[in-house]
């Protein structure tokens, strides 16, 4: 973004949301950061000049208040980063209904509520929306039904905005990160390491195993996803609408059917051997 805009970033207390808020702040944009935890948001406020508005993404009154806070502070609203999210596991046959409800409330209903409150202002500003989904929206893992379903639905929610509001100047796109070093991912890796008895390597060993088939051979960093989000919000992406951008080190380019044959899984040297 090379002109100064007003952007709401949800789930900004850590990880991709925090990195995005910092990136936009460095560019001189006016950022309103939201999340459930107050202290990380207040720290961002002190360090970047963002406006902190702690709130529950699934509470309609809180979401309306978030949009009003942005308008009261800056008089306009140009962009949304729909990043707030939680993860819960389970299969369709054994998941806890409470987990399903929690995930859908935060990962899907929350973005819908924010879009509903913000769209009249985004239309006036000819603004942009970026949804932070996941590669789980494109391809699934074992025991991941609530999270994957919510992220696939978020993807289509954003595409609906692209279709329904494109003629009014609003763009909506989606990024789909793979494993990224965030607090949520760190917790999951620590749990994986414990369940797999990985020993002293702990979460780092789990990251290595989880990204073994990623062509770039590593997890992503929050800033790398933030850079993609910043571009999609910017005038440089003015004709990009309804797009789904994997930010995944190439993992969605792999054909799982060849993995068992190890055609290209072992890293090669610089000669291509």
Give the ranges of each region predicted by the language model.
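Active-site helix of classical SDR
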Residues: 115, 150, 158
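Short, small/polar-rich loop/turn modules that mediate ligand/substrate recognition or access, typified
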Residues: 166, 171, 240-242
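Conserved glycine-rich cofactor-binding loop
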Residues: 13-15
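C-terminal helical subdomain
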Residues: 174, 197-236, 240, 249, ...
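Residue(s) in the substrate-gating loop at a strand-loop-helix junction
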Residues: 134
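Substrate-binding pocket helix/loop in short-chain dehydrogenase/reductase
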Residues: 91-92, 96-104, 210
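Alpha-helical segment proximal to the catalytic Tyr-Lys
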Residues: 120, 163-164, 238
